[in-house]
Amino acid sequence: GDGMNVFASNNVLFDGVFCRNSDDCTTVYATRMGFHGGCRNVTMQNSTLWADVAHPIFIGLHGDVERNEVMENLTYRNIDILDHREMQVDYQGCLAINAGDNNLVRNVRFENIRIENFRQGQLVNLRIFYNKKYCKAPGRGIENVLFKDITYNGDHAELSHIVGYDKERMVKNIRFENLKINGKVISDDMTGKPAWYKTSDMARFFVGEHVGDIVFVK
């Protein structure tokens, strides 16, 4: 089952944890299982995650569609991800934010995260979606997300996805700073990138519709 779940809580710190789980290692959700409200000021640091199924880090799925809840000021730093194995494409992503149930997810920081050669899945999955199995509505947005000093060494990563829902429910203001894949820093001005390529192509990221202001810098 899941590891460290946060439902409708504020001012939470996980420091120095090791999670090996047969589902999500750590999650942040809004209203869920009798707990009501959004989430603010959640930090996980100096920790190690191993997901035999589903996500190492997962944010945003559950909430109260009538309340338009917010999950904000979430920080993940100095983390080792040892494994990720998920056959279902909808539930892949080492670093995953999937906004559902009219949730807004904003001000998220992933920093100094080392990802090993996991078995099956995606590096990043940012989506606003309507998953009818678990949600009653799509999310409202994902915005202001920083990925800083993220490294991945391996050859099992499938195509990552960054996709909004419509012009009112967008993924926006996403910054990758010193994203390093197999020793190569992915940046908008990187050497060897054909002029007609998107920078995201160099990382094997699919950037779909309703995504705004995504940058890759050294």
Describe each PLM feature range.
Residues 1-218:
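Extracellular/periplasmic carbohydrate-active domains that bind, remodel
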